[in-house]
């Protein structure tokens, strides 16, 4: 059986914690898209970790962690990450890397920074992790696939060709130092030696595992609103963030994905530029940011303060629909316990008309939030294990959100730890 854990919104929803929790019952956890541009924060018995490439189930000795073909593989970061967890007494994880994954090169990171510098005030707010240049090269067919590291003749020829192409841009557009082909080849040789013991045919590995009845967990990065097709284009990432892409980025049949757990935050947050209708500012935002997450709302990759907002029912309903949601995991509910009243965005006013349907970006830029205010519960809900033991206003908040988005909230997270979770029955669960 294959399950997917994905985000409904802009990322930062708490997918790492949910994956870490569900991984206890899984055999294999797969990263299927994205790169080291977004971090998943996990709090468990070993401590607090921010993972960028490793799957969040890496802390269980019984699991195999897979880097799928859809990932932008930064090989040094992968191995730095492995060392960072084993240095803190986490057992050495079982790692498998797809021979069809492509390699994020140092020059991708350089080009990312150069382009943001060139764009100036019109920049996209990139994490400067090299993601857009990487995927640009992948689809221009000038990327380096892991399998190519083991074909020396092909590698030498390709290094010269790629360096020539890149150097035209470096010299004439960015006016930056050129790439030395010999140094580039040496870098690729180092990468080959690092990754060689872990490389395999991942799609075949997963196919055999599913025949044996094993459970596979697909871990998504970011969320629906960062998808290049269905998100707030162009302020999006460069690989699909949808569960449907899990079949492609991991190499499994689409019909194998039986459960799609979409993670929603009890309020909204975002990193980077782009339309954010329910955004709040000033002291109100600062207080929510300070209390939020598991130690403040700051990007796990960039450390940038996240933009804050109230829960957005319009965006979340859309995000859940596009993901094909079977279950919603509703996270960081405990954070809202300080508020007397909690506004919720239930619609968008665009050119004088109210809609509950998520629009394209040009219309989204004009949208103003239509807010409904719900009563707060004014207490700490951490430690509660049963849904019925939550304060009445807290339950009403969850049930109101569920009604608005139209998808079953079956998990409620009320703390940062692996076991801070409440399971609930939903009338929407078929």
Where does each model-flagged region fall?
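Non-transmembrane, aqueous-exposed alpha-helical and coiled segments at domain scale
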Residues: 1-430
């Amino acid at each position: 059986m294959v399950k997917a854990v994905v985000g409904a919104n802009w990322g930062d929803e708490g997918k790492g914690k949910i994956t870490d929790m569900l991984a206890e019952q899984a055999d294999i956890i797969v990263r299927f898209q994205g790169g080291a541009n977004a971090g998943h924060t996990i709090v468990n018995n070993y401590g607090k970790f921010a993972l960028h490439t490793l799957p969040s189930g890496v802390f269980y000795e019984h699991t195999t962690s897979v880097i799928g073909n859809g990932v932008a593989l930064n090989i040094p970061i992968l191995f730095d990450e492995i060392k960072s967890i084993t240095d803190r007494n986490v057992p050495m994880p079982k790692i498998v890397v797809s021979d069809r994954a492509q390699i994020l090169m140092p020059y991708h990171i350089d080009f990312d920074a150069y382009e943001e510098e060139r764009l100036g005030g019109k920049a996209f707010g990139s994490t400067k992790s090299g993601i857009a240049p990487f995927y640009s090269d992948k689809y221009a067919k000038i990327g380096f696939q892991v399998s190519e590291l083991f074909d020396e003749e092909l590698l030498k020829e390709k290094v010269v060709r790629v360096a020539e192409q890149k150097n035209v841009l470096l010299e004439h557009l960015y006016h930056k130092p050129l790439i030395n082909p010999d140094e580039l080849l040496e870098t690729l040789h180092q990468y080959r030696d690092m990754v060689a013991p872990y490389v395999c045919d991942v799609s075949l590995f997963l196919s055999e595992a599913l025949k044996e009845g094993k459970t596979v967990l697909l871990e998504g990065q970011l969320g629906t609103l960062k998808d290049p097709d269905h998100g707030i284009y162009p302020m999006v990432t460069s690989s699909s963030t949808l569960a449907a892409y899990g079949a492609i980025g991991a190499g499994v049949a689409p019909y194998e994905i039986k459960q799609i757990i979409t993670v929603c935050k009890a309020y909204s947050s975002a990193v980077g530029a782009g339309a954010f209708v329910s955004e709040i500012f000033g002291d109100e935002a600062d207080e929510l940011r300070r209390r939020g997450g598991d130690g403040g709302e700051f990007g796990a990759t960039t450390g940038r303060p996240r933009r804050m907002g109230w829960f957005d029912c319009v965006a979340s309903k859309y995000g859940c629909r596009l993901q094909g949601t079977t279950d919603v995991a509703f996270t960081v509910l405990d954070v809202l316990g300080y508020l007397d009243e909690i506004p919720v965005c239930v619609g968008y006013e665009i050119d004088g008309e109210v809609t509950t349907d998520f629009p394209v970006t040009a219309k989204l830029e004009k949208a103003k939030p239509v807010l409904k205010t719900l009563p707060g519960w004014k207490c700490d809900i951490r430690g509660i294990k049963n849904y019925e033991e939550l304060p009445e206003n807290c339950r009403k908040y969850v049930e109101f959100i569920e009604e608005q988005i139209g998808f079953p909230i079956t998990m409620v997270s009320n703390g940062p730890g692996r076991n801070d979770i409440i399971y609930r029955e939903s009338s929407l669960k078929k």
